[in-house]
Amino acid sequence: MSRNTATQFVAVLAAAAMGVYSLLVLGATTSLTGAASACQTWPSCNGQWFALQSLDLVVVWGHRTAAALTGLAVVGAAVLAWRTGASRRVRTAVTLALALYPVQVVIGAYTAMSAGAAPFTGVHLTLGVGIFASLVVALAWTLDAQTGDLPSAEWEGEPRHTDDGDPTQPGIVRAYVQLMKPRLMWLLCLVAGAGMALASSQLGAGQQLSAATVVLTLGGGVLSIGASGTFNHVLEREQDEKMARTDDRPVVTDRIPPRNALAFGVVLGVASLAAFAAVNLLTAVLGLTAIAFYSIVYTLVLKPNTRQSTVIGGAAGALPALIGWVAVTGAVGVGGVVLAGVIFLWTPAHFYNLALAYKDDYERGGFPLMPVVEGEAKTRRHIVYYIGATLASAVVLAELTGLGPLYAATTVLLGAVFLYFAIRLHRERDRRAAMRSFHASNAYLGCLLVAVVLDTMVV
């Protein structure tokens, strides 16, 4: 297939996938479910076509129009798959999506006429996720077929240092701050904040989220992240010395002796547990689990020994969601678990970009990450898989927690941006493309978490 045809096929596949995704999100959030009662007939609304007398009817007709346009995109993807000689597995996946789409439309019609009855809604959502998954898998396979055998661009020199701190200004305070990995704090605190916001919506009449709970939980989170980062600096100091990206870290350069760093980590850990315990005991237990998992299970067991360290290690980033939820409710709940699932699935789609950008560095450090042991093509393919899984889990979160239009718009628009940069990564295959995709992943999750907080507590 020609380059132009290949590019066109990828564009249509991506458009079809994101079209299906937008329908899923709109249907799962209150932006559609709240409007469904305004139109309980199909295909017209109470005998009228394109009646737009209210915002609810605008939402309904917008959804139905988008469904028609998305259907055309799915048909276009199927036609191109067969006409361009795509692989058998790609044709199978796209044809499956095409076959299921009319079924999805019929179930959607019954859902509308039954005023969103639970059985129809559940089947409608499940089938929609299946169609979306088929298109995402087809997209990943297509990109792999088009670019998997092509060489990656040569890296332009040694990677720049990305940790906080300036080796030309080795102030002791700066060095201790660097130990705490402050660049991780904003996003992980947002995760905990989103967990608290979701949990606050479950509180009964007369109950509300207190400022003390927020301060203690986020303060404990900052301290626990600092403790985990400090222990990581100490335990990985020999590997860090071999890597250009990390050979300026405080323990490696002996600005802070390992013994002092270890003591600092212990102080931070104890302080974090004290803050969490002031909220409730289960929050403290989860905080201790997070520190131990990152410092011991991930750093000592997973990262040096298995290419699946990124996937399994995602649990460390997911735990703040549970910590935030438990801080408010005192117990683990479904909303907190699903939010943690979103973070868990996002982690490989996020970190694999960094692993690609610094593949040679990680190889020098002796870390068997996926790009090192399985190759760059497979890693890029898995980034697309995990983007799809992350977006699907975000739909489940909306369905179970009643999030609204701000959340819907954020996950669709930023999800499309994330996918776009992953596609560019396949085309360009260099460090800059990997870092653009990495930053897009941060933007997606950061904006999504802010939307959760605003949709739950403000809008």
Swiss-Prot record:
CDD domains documented for this protein: PT_UbiA_Cox10
UniProt keywords, alphabetically: Cell membrane, Heme biosynthesis, Membrane, Transferase, Transmembrane, Transmembrane helix
GO biological process: heme O biosynthetic process
Record field: catalytic activity: heme b + (2E,6E)-farnesyl diphosphate + H2O = Fe(II)-heme o + diphosphate
A GO cellular-component term linked to this record: plasma membrane
Region spans: Protoheme IX prenyltransferase: 185-459
Family annotation (PANTHER family): PROTOHEME IX FARNESYLTRANSFERASE, MITOCHONDRIAL (PTHR43448:SF2)
Other remarks in the entry: Carbon 2 of the heme B porphyrin ring is defined according to the Fischer nomenclature.
Stated name of the protein: Protoheme IX farnesyltransferase
Source organism of the structure: Halobacterium salinarum (strain ATCC 29341 / DSM 671 / R1)
